[in-house]
Every structure is written in C-alpha cells, then in structure tokens.
Amino acid sequence: DAVIQSDCVRVVTDAAGKPPTVPAGAEASAIRPVEPRLEDAFVALLREKRGTEGGRAVHALPPGRATAPVARREGPAVEVHGVNRKFGDFYAVRDVTFEVAAGEVFGLLGPNGAGKSTLFRILCGLLPPTSGTLRVAGLDLRHAAAAARSRIGYMSQRFSLYGNLSVRENLRFFSSAYNLSGARQRERTEWALEQFELAPLSEATSQDLSLGYKQRLAMACALMHEPDILFLDEPTSGVDPLARREFWSRINALAQSGVTIMVTTHFMEEAEYCDRLAIMAEGEVLALGVPSEIKRGQRSEGRPEPTMEEAFIALIEERGRKAPAA
C-alpha cells in the first residue's frame, strides 16, 4: 500500500520488511524506515480481508479528457486577504490571509469551532465576509459570486444527497443544477457511475447506501460540471480507514490533473497528505506551510521530532498562553 504524504510517499511493505523498488529518477538514500501507524496495520488487514478491489487509484477525468489535464491559469487559484466574518460581536473568522496555487492540495486543520466550515462557505460564495478580499478562479467573490460558483465544486460534511432519489437521479439532479443536459449530461452520468464504481447501485436510493458509497456519490455529484476548484468539508468523517485511503487516491488523481483541492479535516494523519496546510483555532490561522515545516517549527528539547498531533497541540497551547485574559 502507498499514499502520497505531502512532499513524500508513505509505502507500507509486507512483514518481511522488503524495501520498495526505487522509482526511476529517485535516490535510494531518500528511502528511510518509519514506525508503522495503527491505521497502516488496519488498512492492511482490511485489504487482506476484502481484497484490493476498491482501493485502486482513480483517474478523476471525464471521457475524452483523459490525456488533457485542466489548463492551469496564471496566478493563484484561491486568494484570501484579511478576511473577517463576524456574527454580532463574535469573530468566526479573524484576519485570515493565504493563497492556494492551481493544482495544489491545501488543507485546513482545526478543532470543531475553529472557523473552517465558515471560511469554506465564504469561499464558495454562500456567505459574505464582513471584510477582506477574496478571489476564486480569478473572480472577485464580492462582484462575481455566481460566475465563481460555476467554477467550483463543493462537498459538505453531511454529503447533501437526496435520500429518496436513486444514485443515477442524484447525479442527474446535481448536473442539471449546473446546466448540463442532453448528451453531455448522459456522458457525465456514465462517467461518474464508472469512475466511482457506482454502476451496480445506480438504481438504489442514496439513503440505502453505506456511508462509504454515500461519500463516493457526494464527490461524484460535486464533480459533474468539471470544476476547476473542489472544496471538501470534512469529507471522510465517519468512514473506515480503507475508504478514507481510497478517497485520498481520488483527491491525488484530481490534483495531478490540475484541479485545485481545498479540504478541511480534524484527522492529523490526513493533514499530512496535503501539499500545504493552515492550522486554525478560534477563527485565526496559527500556522501556514508544508506539514513537515510546521512540525519542524515546533521542535523542542522534549520534542525533537514532533508528530503532527504534537505540533498541533503545541500551537494551540502557545495561542492560549498569548491570549489576553478575559
């Protein structure tokens, strides 16, 4: 098993400990052993029981575009500068600034109430900011929110499916919401059923699907109109580790095709799958950068090689010490 982890690839070998084959162009010295995680063992056991079907990487591209990646526009795909969102006197998002490059997997990590979902709704044009500037796919959200929404896909943490509709009907409904019809709609529907392995369940109602299949369907619905940018709000909550690993294979395939991915999560291991990461708490960004850089920034005598969880806790505790007394 293997998964892209920020600026490296994490490979799980068999019990014999046989080292992986070095890819062409890679240095053998770049391979180093690491301690296995509980998730690694759990995924290996699940794969052994279920077989490897369903764990394959997926090329998240429509028919006819398998060799034509998304054209990367000049400049950042997402620009956020000094954004605030207040509800009365309460700041849900406070002075947030960052940029996301085209084709980048950018993560927002934080506890419940950190402001991640509020910021996502602002970026999707669903909630106006109190102040600050935002550009998505080169469009100013204050003046061209409708045009920007046509360029993005959004998958909420509750999946937002219509339970009484079949899998196929959900795909048709969401595609029609983005003005797809006729042959193009049929083509995209068949693409989604094939690529997300939903064809055997195409006539099942979405309320009868397992959580893992609901996740697949929700992502397929968000991609029906071929968005340039995909927003995923805690998309793997409640699914098993194997389904989560498969989901990240799809995310990486999308990013490699040029789609920009923004994802919120509270899973520490998932945060390390992102190219870059912003750690949020109480509406503010506490750290921004490559996951390995964020971890190195929290080294101390007692934590010479901090894990992402240890770095996260250290940042939260540091913020608590600096916060003014009530």
What function would you assign to each model-found segment?
Residues 288-289:
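ABC ATPase "signature
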Residues 230-233:
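Catalytic Walker B motif of ABC-type/P-loop ATPase nucleotide-binding domains
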Residues 172, 176, 183-201:
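Conserved ABC ATPase "signature" region
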Residues 219:
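Hydrophobic anchor residue at the start of the ABC signature
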Residues 226:
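Conserved catalytic motifs of ABC-family nucleotide-binding domains
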Residues 30, 35-84, 319-326:
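ABC-family P-loop ATPase nucleotide-binding domain
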